[in-house]
């Protein structure tokens, strides 16, 4: 357990380093709101699609394709989304419901979830986690686009407009484009893959610096209760329900452990990028990311300990 706890800290500490760097750079006026807006757009349209494309390109789709696991994960994700949105309707002002919902169901599986899966289960964790990550990207971005479109002042919410928003989402386009390359094991020219890696490697630091640049004590106080509520749903409520459902479904061992890690991951940095693109309450999105990442160091270890104590993983 100490090794898992230290692994979690090794993953979350760099995240907070980038967040606090963003706070510092904004405080000393080395970055401003214009930079944050432009950089967030760059991440959403260019660097994050490159990261997702390369991540799927390198996944072994043949080795870890488990239909039952994928079906359960898809159903549990849809149920989590519905529960989070339903709770937001009763809990939030209308203009914040999309941001609240996205923060409560969208996990950082591509970074923290996958890293912990690899730490616990080695190559098997990487291959199975990568397959789930591909499904996650498609579901999370589609559902996030839908819920943000319903409440966004700049995104139309009629069915055709929502469909267009989903289809034209750069993150979804990158996932769909990468799938045949991964399935048929088609490589990219060396120079092109290296160039893509350069872009991909800027994604997380740049996104986190932008998040840190938006943080302020006033913003945290303003969105404190909503951010805390969404964070509790994300880190305690939904992971408990989803993991219990997986246990009842019959999953044990590595499959149950990886499902827990994915459902228990903190809110993804991409939620801030999409919130800003939709002209939503990005300060609330940033606060949820910070709170859930803090909570993850505790909830992940407690959950793993409990599952190991019960002999289920």
Label the predicted regions.
Residues 1-313:
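Alpha-helical transmembrane segments of multi-pass small-molecule/ion transporters
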